[in-house]
């Protein structure tokens, strides 16, 4: 068993608004939530692995990637990266 602790970071949400459809393509928050659930279960199965939920911190009131945190519905803006960095600082 390795002695290194592993932090498994959630997959980030997307904005599924019509204007972002081409950029987001086949990604949906429903699929991302299922993947994040699997990541949580994986982390729970191993002593040296923690799950870091950044997904929830980036959502708006309707469950999409908040407009303030994205440049194109998929990639984070500077404000989005601040949220990510804060979550990582709290974990590390």
Which role does the model predict for each range below?
Residues 1-5:
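A short helix->loop->beta-strand "cap" motif at the edges of active sites that frequently abuts
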Residues 7-10:
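Alpha/beta-hydrolase-fold catalytic nucleophile elbow
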Residues 12-16, 56-60:
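Solvent-exposed loop/turn segments at secondary-structure junctions
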Residues 16-53:
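Substrate-gating cap/lid alpha-helix
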Residues 18-22, 64-69:
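Short acidic, glycine/proline-rich loop/turn micro-motifs
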Residues 38-45, 57, 61, 87-91:
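Structured segments of extracytoplasmic/periplasmic soluble domains
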Residues 41, 50, 61, 66-68:
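Short, functionally important structural connectors and interaction interfaces within domains
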Residues 69-92:
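Histidine-centered active-site loop/cap adjacent to the catalytic His
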């Amino acid at each position: 068993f390795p002695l290194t602790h592993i932090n498994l970071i959630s997959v980030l949400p997307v904005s599924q608004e019509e204007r972002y459809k081409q950029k987001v393509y086949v990604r949906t928050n429903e699929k991302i939530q299922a993947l994040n659930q699997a990541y949580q279960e994986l982390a729970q199965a191993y002593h040296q692995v923690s799950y870091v939920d950044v997904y929830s911190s980036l959502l708006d009131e309707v469950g999409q990637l908040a407009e303030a945190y994205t440049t194109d519905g998929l990639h984070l803006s500077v404000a989005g990266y601040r949220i990510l960095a804060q979550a990582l600082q709290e974990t590390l």
